[in-house]
C-alpha cells in the first residue's frame, strides 16, 4: 500500500506530519507538499514556469519533498515522477482550519484531492478546526494536539483501504473538531457558505488603494450540513464528493 501525503500549508507544517502519523501503520508513505503556504489556491496548476522538488528534512528528522508550486502540482509530480509506484491512496492535510461548505472549491487542500481523483486515486481531504485564528496560514512548527485527529483519520483510511470508496464517490472531505465529543464520523451535506465574504479597502502611504478579501465565519444552523455537524454537534463531519460536474439536467427545450 503506497500512500501519498500532501497539503496546502506547506511541507514544514506539523499537520502533514500528523497526517503521515495517522496512516503510517497502513503502508509506505511519501510526503510531497508545497515549499510555501498555498492556502486558497484551489485546483491551480503551474504552467508558465518550471517546478523544483527539493528533498527536505522535516522537524521530526524524516524527509519529504518540497515543491515550488501548488498542491495540484505536488500530486502531479508525485504520481508522474517522484514516486516509483502510483499511490493507492492520497491524503491531503491535515489542514490547519476547517474546509467546509461549497467554499471548498477555493481550498488548496481540496484541490490536491481533485487532482488525485483525475488520476483515479482515492483521496481523503483532512482539515482540523482550530480555536485560535493566529494558528492559521502559518508555516512551520505549531503546538496543536493532533492525537485525536490522527485516530479518526486512521479509522476512515482503514475503511477506504478495506472496502474501497463508496460507489460514485471520488473524494472524502473530513473535518474534525478541535476537541470532538467522540470519534463518531457523521456524514454531512455541504452548507451553502462558510464565510460572509467582503472586501476591505485601504490606502497605502502613496495614496493608492489596495484591498483585502475578508470574511466572518457563518454558523449555519441547518441540521445535516457540515457546518452544523462541526460547529454545533462538535462531531467529525465527512462529505462524499464526486468530480462528475454534469448537472444531469436535460436543457434541450430551454435551448430551443
Swiss-Prot record:
Localization per Swiss-Prot or TrEMBL: Cytoplasm
Molecular function GO labels: 5'-nucleotidase activity; metal ion binding; nucleotide binding
Keywords per UniProt: Cytoplasm, Hydrolase, Metal-binding, Nucleotide-binding
Names of required cofactors: a divalent metal cation
Name of the top EC class for this enzyme: hydrolase
Xref: InterPro entries: SurE, SurE-like_Pase/nucleotidase, SurE-like_sf
Cellular component terms per the entry's GO annotation: cytoplasm
SUPFAM superfamilies: SurE-like (SSF64167)
Family as reported in the entry's similarity comment: Belongs to the SurE nucleotidase family.
Function: Nucleotidase that shows phosphatase activity on nucleoside 5'-monophosphates.
Protein's name according to its UniProt entry: 5'-nucleotidase SurE
Gene encoding the protein: surE
Amino acid at each position: 500500500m503506497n500512500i501519498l501525503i500532501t497539503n496546502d500549508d506547506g511541507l514544514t507544517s506539523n499537520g502533514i506530519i500528523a497526517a503521515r502519523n495517522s496512516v503510517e501503520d497502513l503502508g509506505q508513505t511519501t510526503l510531497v507538499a508545497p515549499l510555501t503556504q498555498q492556502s486558497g489556491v484551489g485546483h491551480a496548476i503551474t504552467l508558465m514556469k518550471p517546478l523544483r522538488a527539493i528533498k527536505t528534512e522535516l522537524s521530526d528528522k524524516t524527509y519529504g519533498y518540497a515543491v515550488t508550486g501548488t498542491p495540484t502540482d505536488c500530486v502531479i509530480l508525485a504520481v508522474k515522477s517522484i514516486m516509483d509506484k502510483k499511490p493507492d491512496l492520497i491524503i491531503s492535510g491535515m489542514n490547519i482550519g476547517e474546509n467546509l461548505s461549497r467554499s471548498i472549491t477555493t481550498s488548496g487542500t481540496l484541490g490536491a484531492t481533485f487532482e488525485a481523483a483525475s488520476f483515479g486515486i482515492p483521496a481523503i481531504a483532512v482539515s482540523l478546526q482550530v480555536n485560535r485564528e493566529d494558528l492559521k496560514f502559518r508555516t512551520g512548527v505549531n503546538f496543536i494536539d493532533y492525537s485525536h485527529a490522527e485516530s479518526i483519520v486512521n479509522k476512515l483510511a482503514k475503511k477506504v483501504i478495506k472496502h474501497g470508496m463508496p460507489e460514485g464517490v471520488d473524494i472524502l472531505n473530513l473535518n474534525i473538531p478541535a476537541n470532538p465529543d467522540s470519534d463518531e464520523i457523521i456524514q454531512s451535506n455541504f452548507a451553502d457558505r462558510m464565510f460572509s465574504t467582503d472586501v476591505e479597502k485601504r490606502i497605502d502611504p502613496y495614496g493608492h488603494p489596495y484591498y483585502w478579501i475578508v470574511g466572518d465565519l457563518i454558523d449555519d444552523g441547518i441540521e445535516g450540513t457540515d457546518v452544523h455537524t462541526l460547529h454545533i454537534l462538535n462531531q467529525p463531519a465527512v462529505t462524499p464528493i464526486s468530480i462528475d460536474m454534469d448537472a444531469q439536467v436535460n436543457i434541450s427545450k430551454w435551448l430551443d
